[in-house]
Amino acid sequence: MASRHSPQTAAQPDAADKAQALRLTPVSRETETRLDAYLDLLRLWQAKTNLVAPSTLPQLWTRHVADSLQLLALAPTARRWLDFGSGGGFPGIVLACAMAEHDGGHVTLVERNAKKAAFLREALRVTGAPGTVMLADIGDNVDRFPRALDCITARAVAPLHQLIGFAAPLMTEGSKVLFLKGQDVEAELTEATKYWKIEPQLHASLTGGQGWIVELDRIVRHAPSTTNPEAAAHDRH
């Protein structure tokens, strides 16, 4: 009798998970092949570098890949992306795999952990996806980051008001941000409006649960106010 941990039994839930993800967020055969290569590499590295929560490994396609791919529908013409805190590559590597089909497609992946940055570089090499890895903290001098971006992303990196602060200097006419957030999105938006004038669009995650995508296409910092000492202190920093 086969062990419950055998490749045969492990492959079945993975195949079902993949099929469900591709129903939610269809991709071309070429992109699917790149994503397969990426996930094979992730599983290999996961043993020595914690790239994703171990409990989510059986649902890599739905929990992570589809969650990342859904951003493409919200920015269908975007070709130049920047992903803050790329970690294990969600959404950055997934987006890069999709951008390989488009002329001028490119994803800049910003990651402060050297081991994870090394993984991201290897993932770009193995998949042939167009991208660049920057070993940097997302709070570093923004002059280091590329300009002329179409879309800025982040997933499970920092509170919303901080992410907006990191993205604001990189925004140009026609660009947008897409931040993947969880069940506390309303509280985070309330906090963010203390510091920023924003008109967010909220999109429920296609992958279910309590996930949300915050879409912003304009960010303006509130002027320092003596009636809002907390915002004024934030502005000084």
Curated annotation (Swiss-Prot):
- GO CC annotation: cytosol
Where does it primarily localize?
Answer: cytoplasm
Q: What is its EC number?
A: 2.1.1.170
Write out the ranges of the annotated region (Disordered): 1-25
Q: Where is the composition biased (Low complexity)?
A: 7-21
**Molecular-function GO terms, alphabetical:** rRNA (guanine-N7-)-methyltransferase activity
The keyword S-adenosyl-L-methionine appears for this protein: yes
Origin: domain of life? Bacteria
Q: Which UniProt keywords apply?
A: Cytoplasm, Methyltransferase, rRNA processing, S-adenosyl-L-methionine, Transferase
Q: Which Pfam families match?
A: GidB
Q: Where in the cell is it found?
A: Cytoplasm
Q: Which Gene3D superfamilies match?
A: Vaccinia Virus protein VP39 (3.40.50.150)
Q: Which residues bind S-adenosyl-L-methionine?
A: G85, F90, R155
Q: Give the reaction(s) catalysed.
A: guanosine(527) in 16S rRNA + S-adenosyl-L-methionine = N(7)-methylguanosine(527) in 16S rRNA + S-adenosyl-L-homocysteine
Q: Which family does it belong to?
A: Belongs to the methyltransferase superfamily. RNA methyltransferase RsmG family.
PANTHER family, alphabetized: S-ADENOSYL-L-METHIONINE-DEPENDENT METHYLTRANSFERASES SUPERFAMILY PROTEIN (PTHR31760:SF0)
Function of this protein? Specifically methylates the N7 position of guanine in position 527 of 16S rRNA.
UniProt protein name: Ribosomal RNA small subunit methyltransferase G
* Organism field: Rhodopseudomonas palustris (strain HaA2)
Gene it is expressed from: rsmG
